[in-house]
């Protein structure tokens, strides 16, 4: 049995899965530890990959934040990982250490492909899909007819820097009122400081459902900003499905209900809006099958000359966690 490995690099962990020819996740590992700078990105990825028995591995895929050139294997502007405008040769570093072919992709785009593949393997075949990650930042990945949309400059899906409120604060990108400034995890924490640290979105939307007038106002404003972005995605790409992931999505059904209520409000006054985006098209990412590492593994498989799509799905294997040195 041969398999590919997919790795998802985050600011505090690297999660890896091994996927066989059928699409089954045969094993998975997570390496915990703060990741800061290109050297630590490489070290964390290698630690996760070396957790597997590599005798049957044929290729490796890595999803990483920032601007990714999948042709050269280089990463820039992965700010949360300490990688700036100078290109970092991530793929070459991993290839040199392990002697396997390596492909890299933006983490949210890899997650979009992973989500699309998971649906395909259970017989759900969306023609197009968008994955929207809402956490420290906001970004999207789009899959059209089974293929990732990257864009001319590798910036497709950077919706965090769509201006949605020109009266809001200045963004680090230089614009005022970007979506990321008003609706990301840190933005919600600033708008609702009553919530516990790291869990402001859950506290906010729960308070709004509970009838707190101040929470209702803040939650409504944030849901409005996010619905504007989702509507833009639906209009631009005519997506069958929009899946929300990231830390803010941990707020769960109360958060999703607020988004769907906004979509319903638009549909009530416009037949075009009702056709463009329906509430049931927007869902939250599944927790039991992380799409990021799966998508990276799929990209690794697609890079092989003999690649063919798997036709069945078996339940994921166990999760193991180790601590980074």
Feature roles, as predicted:
Residues 74-86:
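A charged helix-plus-loop insertion that forms the helical arch/lid used to bind
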Residues 33-34, 83, 156-158:
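A short acidic/small-residue loop/turn micro-motif
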Residues 1-59, 69-74, 92, 96-100, ...:
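ATP-binding/phosphotransfer module of carbohydrate and carboxylate kinases, centering on a glycine-rich
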Residues 126-182:
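Glycine-rich phosphate-binding loop of actin/hexokinase-like ATP-binding domains
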Residues 29-31, 79, 152:
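Short hydrophobic alpha-helix segments
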Residues 13, 108-110, 135-139:
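Conserved A3 ("GATE") glycine/threonine-rich loop of ANL adenylate-forming enzymes
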Residues 101-115, 130:
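ATP-dependent carbohydrate kinase catalytic cores
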Residues 8, 61-65, 105, 130-137, ...:
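Short beta-strand segments
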């Amino acid at each position: 049995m041969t398999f590919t490995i997919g790795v998802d690099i985050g600011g505090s962990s690297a999660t890896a899965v091994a996927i066989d020819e059928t699409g089954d996740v045969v094993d998975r590992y997570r390496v915990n530890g703060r990741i800061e700078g290109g050297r630590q990105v490489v070290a964390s990825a290698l630690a996760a990959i070396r957790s597997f028995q590599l005798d049957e591995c044929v290729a490796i895929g890595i999803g990483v934040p920032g601007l990714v050139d999948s042709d050269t294997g280089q990463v820039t502007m992965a700010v949360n990982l300490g990688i700036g405008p100078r290109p970092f040769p991530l793929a070459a570093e991993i290839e040199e250490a392990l002697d396997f072919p390596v492909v890299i992709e933006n983490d949210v785009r890899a997650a979009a492909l992973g989500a699309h593949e998971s649906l395909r393997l259970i017989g759900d075949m969306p023609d197009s899909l968008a994955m929207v990650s809402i956490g420290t930042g906001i970004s999207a990945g789009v899959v059209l007819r089974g293929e990732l949309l990257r864009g001319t400059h590798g910036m497709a899906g950077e919706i965090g820097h769509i201006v949605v409120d020109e009266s809001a604060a200045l963004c680090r990108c230089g614009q005022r009122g970007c979506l990321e400034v008003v609706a990301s995890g840190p933005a919600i924490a600033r708008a609702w400081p009553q919530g516990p640290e790291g869990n402001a979105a859950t506290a906010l939307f729960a308070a709004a459902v509970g009838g707190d007038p101040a929470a209702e106002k803040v939650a409504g404003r944030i849901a409005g900003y996010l619905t504007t972005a989702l509507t833009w995605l639906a209009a631009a790409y005519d997506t069958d499905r929009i899946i929300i992931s990231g830390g803010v999505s941990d707020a769960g059904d109360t958060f999703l209900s607020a988004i769907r209520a906004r979509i319903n409000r638009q549909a009530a006054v416009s037949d075009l809006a009702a056709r463009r985006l329906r509430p049931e098209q927007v869902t939250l990412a599944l927790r039991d099958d992380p799409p990021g590492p799966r998508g990276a593994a799929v990209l690794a498989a697609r890079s092989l000359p003999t690649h063919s799509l798997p036709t069945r799905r078996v339940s994921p294997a166990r999760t193991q966690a180790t601590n980074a040195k």
